[in-house]
Design a protein with these regions (language model features):
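Core catalytic lobe of class I
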Residues: 2-169
């Protein structure tokens, strides 16, 4: 078992190679948050840790993983133990650009992965309390790609809840 790098009543942080630290803890978790090296540059610190998604699957039921589209596509076979659910885009204020011939990267993807039945995964509808007050009236719609919908009417309040956007600042 490793010695925690930091610990208080709410959180315990361990520092080290994930592939060694997680198995040594001897526990299973509901959610894992990972931000691995993407393995996209020749920099010495940017080396993909082979096998880590499979180790994570042995100890976690769900996972948020930060990365780039290239990282996920290049390593898609390593995520075979996981089911992909959704992704959000984290828009960064200051982007990074190590290549002059590409767009300056001002975002990263955070993708949600899970194992087992979706009904057994803890998920809460993500909302934010910054809705603009308005009244919406929707007419009944014919069957299209979302199915038939009846008429709807609702009023939102200033500062009330709304679904969170998939692009997060």
């Amino acid at each position: 078992m490793t010695t925690p790098y930091y610990s208080d009543d709410a959180v315990t942080l361990h520092h080290g190679d994930f592939r060694e630290v997680l198995p040594s803890l001897g526990l299973d978790v509901d959610l894992l948050i990972a931000d691995p090296p993407y393995g996209e540059t020749s920099l010495t610190w940017d080396r993909w840790p082979d096998g880590w998604p499979s180790i994570a699957a042995q100890h976690a039921r769900s996972m948020w993983c930060f990365g780039s589209m290239r990282m996920f596509l290049n390593r898609r076979d390593e995520f075979a133990d996981w089911r992909f659910s959704q992704e959000v885009v984290w828009e960064k204020h200051n982007g990074s650009g190590l290549h002059a011939d590409r767009f300056k990267r001002v975002h990263e993807f955070a993708s949600f992965w899970y194992r087992g039945p979706w009904s057994e995964i803890h998920h809460v509808t993500p909302t934010t309390n910054d809705a603009t007050a308005r009244t919406v009236r929707r007419k009944a719609k014919p069957v299209h790609h979302q199915g038939a919908r009846g008429p709807a009417h609702y009023i939102s309040e200033d500062g009330g809840p709304r679904l969170m956007r998939s692009v997060i600042y």
